[in-house]
């Protein structure tokens, strides 16, 4: 049970940092291209530690994102649940891809997230986003290898430290 507790702490810390990163102010032209850090973190943990990142957590943290960003209540929750569901559904295939192929799969997941976002905007009568709206999945794909390696390295260090303590 101890390794799960350590992974869960890392998961909560990573989600909190992802939510805070998304709140950082950027120029308008750059803010539209910013990848959804929460989506990247949830995707990583759904791939590597599905016991801590399930649909319930995706819904809960999606609601937190809705509250923090002041958007439509339930919008991010729906998007994160669908993202995590698709990740969990194809998890056994995606885990064995090299990181660059995983980045392509993450691009497809983030593109699906953008399509859902566009659909929600259309249903709510919001304005149509500019074309740079579609660059965010590309940026997410480019950032994915570093996110993956960073979080994987932290998980590995945590496991090694726990093994040394138990020995």
Give names to the regions the model predicted.
Residues 1-167:
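Terminal, non-globular segments
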């Amino acid at each position: 049970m101890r390794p799960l507790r350590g992974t869960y702490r890392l998961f909560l810390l990573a989600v909190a940092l992802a939510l805070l990163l998304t709140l950082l102010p950027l120029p308008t032209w750059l803010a539209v291209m910013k990848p959804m850090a929460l989506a990247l973190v949830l995707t990583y943990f759904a791939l590597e530690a599905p016991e801590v990142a399930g649909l319930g957590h995706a819904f809960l943290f999606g609601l937190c994102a809705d509250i923090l960003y002041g958007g439509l209540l339930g919008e991010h929750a729906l998007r994160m649940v669908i993202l995590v569901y698709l990740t969990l559904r194809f998890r056994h295939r995606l885990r064995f891809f090299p990181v660059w192929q995983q980045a392509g799969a993450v691009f497809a997941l983030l593109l699906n997230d953008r399509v859902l976002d566009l659909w929600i905007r259309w249903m709510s009568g919001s304005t149509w986003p500019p074309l740079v709206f579609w660059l965010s999945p590309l940026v997410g794909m480019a950032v994915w290898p570093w996110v993956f390696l960073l979080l994987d390295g932290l998980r590995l260090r945590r496991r090694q430290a726990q093994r040394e303590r138990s020995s």
